């Protein structure tokens, strides 16, 4: 895949958008350290970015199916490129201006996700999409390590304002680098309202029982397992182990495991791809399970490495099956439904977990999270067509 020029351009574009996305919170964190932004202001800016993302995802799914996927990527990237310097302009002056600009950046981020997913299906032949998706998700995992590291290194020689403008340049690359896909569908005079068009994508998703089951399992794991990582892991690292090194080590182990999983899925095609993917998703249950008892930190690291490995064993076949099975003209809308539910539930889970821990205690909540992570994929595996993530199995 890395020898094909069109895919290289697509891969570089997605990588640039990933770097810009992951770098922004760390750059704003540096602004808090140098007192040009308060902690409360940081929370507001990041919250508005998330809101912009969630609003844009379903809208962009409709637009990417209605018009050109490449055009949606272009305008999404340009939105991020233009809004990022505005965040820099508001730094130390106006949190309101920063928040409005961050909402536009978040909208650009949300708009490009389903469009990139659909554009991949246009650029890459069907029999090569699994290694292509593996290469893209590998880039995502590398950026989670590279973005904070690069930010810290660049901060030695560049100020926060310059770094924020730099994320705009990354968004510009994301806008300009990807290749053209298929020609946009011919416009029709009887276009349905956007909400009705999005509903058509929902109906397409309902035609695929494996998709609904897998999405429900993914949502359950994100709501419980991801929330345990976001809330419980930092506190347990501090209170039980007396050091933030356990938090850093667990997150690093997760990323390393995910990298291994992406490399593995570039070549491995199990016969029962759906079941293998759901087993991988269930591995996330070991993350909250490792936090239940005062085990050695190495056990926590191993559990998070397994979770990272498993999430890519799920992600790569999941994206590939969606691109293969969903009707092409509805792919962006179905992908936007996927991203809306999976990303949208993450902050909801975080909001619920802390009160649940206060009410019931650490151990019952973590045990419940682990149980859900194990049982939800197992239940999804029982649904007809889940074995290979294909409706053909039902015939």
Regions found by a protein language model. Name each.
Residues 1-395:
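Alpha-helical transmembrane-bundle signature of multi-pass membrane transport and export proteins
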């Amino acid at each position: 895949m890395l020898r094909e020029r069109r895919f290289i351009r697509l891969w570089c574009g997605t990588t640039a958008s990933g770097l810009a996305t992951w770098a922004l919170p760390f750059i704003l964190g540096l602004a808090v350290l140098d007192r040009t932004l308060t902690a409360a202001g940081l929370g507001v800016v990041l919250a508005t970015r998330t809101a912009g993302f969630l609003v844009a995802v379903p809208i962009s799914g409709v637009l990417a199916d209605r018009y050109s996927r490449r055009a949606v990527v272009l305008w999404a990237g340009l939105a991020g490129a233009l809004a990022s310097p505005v965040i820099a302009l508001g730094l130390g002056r106006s949190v309101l201006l920063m928040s409005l600009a961050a909402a536009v950046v978040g909208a650009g981020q949300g708009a490009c996700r389903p469009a990139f997913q659909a554009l991949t299906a246009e650029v890459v032949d069907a029999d090569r999409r699994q290694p292509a998706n593996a290469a893209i998700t590998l880039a995502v995992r590398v950026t989670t390590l590279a973005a904070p590291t690069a930010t810290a290194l660049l901060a030695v020689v560049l100020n926060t304002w310059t770094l924020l403008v730099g994320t705009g340049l990354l968004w510009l690359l994301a806008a300009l680098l990807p290749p053209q896909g298929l020609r946009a569908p011919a416009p029709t005079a009887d276009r349905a309202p956007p909400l009705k068009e999005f509903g058509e994508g929902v109906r397409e998703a309902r035609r695929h029982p494996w998709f609904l089951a897998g999405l429900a399992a993914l949502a359950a794991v994100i709501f419980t397992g991801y929330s345990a990582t976001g809330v419980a892991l930092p506190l347990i690292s501090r209170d039980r182990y007396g050091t933030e090194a356990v938090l850093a080590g667990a997150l690093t182990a997760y990323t390393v495991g995910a990298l291994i999983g992406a490399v593995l899925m570039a070549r491995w095609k199990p016969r029962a791809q759906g079941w293998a993917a759901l087993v991988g998703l269930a591995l996330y249950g070991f993350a909250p399970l490792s936090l239940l008892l005062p085990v050695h930190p190495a056990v926590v690291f191993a559990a998070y490495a397994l979770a990272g490995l498993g999430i890519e064993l799920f992600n790569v076949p999941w994206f590939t099956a969606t691109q293969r099975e969903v009707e092409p003209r509805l792919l962006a809308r179905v992908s936007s439904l996927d991203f809306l539910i999976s990303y949208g539930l993450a902050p909801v889970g975080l909001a619920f977990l802390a009160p649940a821990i206060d009410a019931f205690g650490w151990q019952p909540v973590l045990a419940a999270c682990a149980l859900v992570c194990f049982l939800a994929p197992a239940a999804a595996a029982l649904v007809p067509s889940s074995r290979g993530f294909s409706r053909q199995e039902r015939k």
